[in-house]
From Swiss-Prot:
CDD domains: Hsp33 (cd00498). GO terms for molecular function: protein folding chaperone; unfolded protein binding. Belongs to the HSP33 family. It comes from Parasynechococcus marenigrum (strain WH8102). Keywords: Chaperone, Cytoplasm, Disulfide bond, Redox-active center, Zinc. This is 33 kDa chaperonin.
Length: 305
């Protein structure tokens, strides 16, 4: 099943909804980075959140970066998501596993707080027009959903609910995705609707289970979560779009980046290693640069000096 993102409204247009399925996308990230169970879940949640944030950008080439900077053993993470449905990312420690925690109902879950530790969520929105918008908020839980909701409230003054979840077993990742809920400005002036939406969001239990049951049928997920709010997908080309893991790195860009190192360092690299091997943090692609290629770069720098 292909991953997708759905935009919808509810309560007669007073509520904005965005739902995303990222199962195949996160599986690809896990394969590329050889991620542990915990790091798979953390990165997957951030990918879903990044895509949902990017979905509201007005320009097709707009992008959102989420960076978790913290003192926990995960050593942070980074996600780059686009309005076009592409996303990539990495974690600081792709092998991290911690003992699970048990909630009041006896269910086991990942210890996101211990993995993330204390720190900040940094968000950058770039629409390609002038300087990107940057904002930083303190981490709330490390589970990504609450942290992104805090960003939306404090940095964009938009009260929101952000749900992210997954189903994972010792065999594979079964499902992954998220749901963004926002009340629109005019509807925010209706206390009864605000109270009803708040109540419905608090009543959502086992979001991961609901997501898993609905699969990529995100319209069914919206009805399952908000049956009495009449959720309806948008009636235009933006109602639904595909989502996939995609990295913009290329060999040409990577080789060109070597020029920034300067002649002295490149000459030292040539003498010691006879070439270079470049690795992209976002997708783990490796690019090998031969000795003659390095010599050509050194000559190019010499000619320009």
């Amino acid at each position: 099943m292909a991953d997708r993102l759905v935009r919808a409204t509810a309560a007669g247009g007073g509520i904005r909804l965005v739902a995303v399925s990222t199962t195949e996308t996160v599986r690809e990230a896990r394969r590329r980075h050889d991620l542990s169970f915990l790091s798979t879940v953390m990165l997957g949640r951030a990918m879903a959140a990044g895509l949902m944030l990017a979905s509201s950008m007005k320009v097709r080439h707009g992008r959102v970066n989420l960076r978790l900077g913290s003192d926990g053993p995960l050593r942070g993470l980074m996600v780059d998501a686009g309005r076009d449905g592409t996303v990539r990312g990495y974690v600081g420690d792709n092998t991290l596993e911690l003992d699970p925690v048990i909630d009041a109902d006896g269910n086991h879950s990942f210890n996101f707080k211990a993995a993330a530790g204390t720190g900040y969520l940094h968000v950058m929105r770039d629409d390609g027009k002038g300087e990107p918008f940057n904002s930083t908020v303190e981490l709330v839980s490390g589970g990504i959903g609450d942290d992104v909701a805090s960003y939306l409230l404090h940095s964009e003054q938009t009260p929101s609910a952000v749900f992210v979840g997954e189903r994972i077993s010792s065999q594979q990742l079964h499902s992954s995705g998220g749901l963004l809920v926002q009340i629109l400005p005019k509807a925010a002036e209706e206390p009864a609707l605000v109270e009803l939406l708040d109540q419905r969001c608090r009543e959502i239990e086992d979001f991961s289970g609901r997501l898993d049951r609905c699969g990529d049928q995100l319209e069914d997920l919206l009805v399952d979560v908000f049956p009495d709010l009449d959720p309806r997908p948008l009636e235009d080309a933006d109602a639904s779009q595909s989502v996939n893991f995609h990295c913009r790195c290329t060999r040409e860009r990577s080789v060109a980046a070597l020029l920034l190192m300067g002649r002295t360092e490149l000459a030292d690299m040539l003498e010691k290693d006879g070439g270079a091997e470049l690795n992209c943090h976002f997708c783990s692609n490796n690019y090998v640069v031969s000795g003659p290629e390095l010599e050509g770069l050194i000559a190019e720098l010499a000619a320009a000096s």
